[in-house]
A protein has these predicted regions:
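Patatin-like phospholipase
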Residues: 1-221
Length: 221
């Protein structure tokens, strides 16, 4: 990650200002798949119920796609394609998709409704005390960038409330046991577009530590 994520092929502000993607996720996924191919035979050997949450680039609706050998690579690329940072949606079976963060950033409501789900692990990328504030940026994007895609624009304007509702649900739902896993609120954590190797390495190590603790907490839930 410290190598490929910091290469100029991946992040290019010059390309972005000329109308291209800031983050070339197709290049990243192609490189990673070539060098470290996903072992799909093992992944799907036991027919797991594995879903990817995406946002339809036109309607703005959340789409929950069951992973298969035919869609997993494009689905994972779509699930990391953040609108604006990546201008082109990812085509999956003829439909355009972006990351699920617009329509359903924390799909805990949907997961809780699935058959035989008695406990859930909710992985957040924000500290525990974080709630999403109303964003003028979302309002501007909805009005000017996505004005021709009214469904997506409408979904963008309501995502703050959906996110905060999901956080509250994760902490108050009575039907399931829910483990909420959050990164610690530390100043040295890397931001989304960080190019600082030390911060990225530190954040990775914090993530490993947090993940190991989450595994133990899950066993005891």
């Amino acid at each position: 990650f410290l190598d490929r994520a910091l290469r100029s092929e991946f992040t290019q502000y010059g390309r972005f200002f000329k109308g291209g993607d800031l983050l070339d996720l197709k290049w990243m996924w192609d490189v990673v798949e070539k060098e470290y191919p996903l072992n799909q035979a093992d992944l799907f050997a036991n027919h797991p119920e594995f879903y990817m949450v995406l946002t339809h680039a036109i309607s703005g609706d959340a789409t929950y796609i069951k992973a298969s050998k035919d869609n997993i690579l494009d689905g994972l690329r779509a699930s990391s394609s953040i609108p604006v940072l990546t201008r082109q949606a990812v085509d999956i079976f003829g439909e355009p998709y972006f990351d699920g963060g617009v329509a359903d950033a924390l799909p805990v409501h949907w997961a809780a409704q699935q058959h035989d789900v008695s406990k859930l692990m909710v992985l957040r990328t924000r500290p525990k005390n974080y709630y999403k504030a109303s964003s003028k940026g979302d309002q501007l994007l909805a009005k000017y960038v996505f004005q021709q895609k009214r469904g997506f624009a409408k979904s963008l304007l309501s995502r703050t409330q959906r996110y905060n509702d999901s956080v509250q649900f994760a902490r108050s739902a009575s039907g399931q046991k829910i483990l909420e896993v959050c990164p610690p609120d530390l100043k040295n954590m890397a931001g989304r577009l960080s190019q600082n190797k030390a911060k990225i390495r530190y954040s990775y190590d914090v993530g490993i530590e947090t993940g190991l603790k989450a595994i133990e907490d899950w066993k005891n839930l």
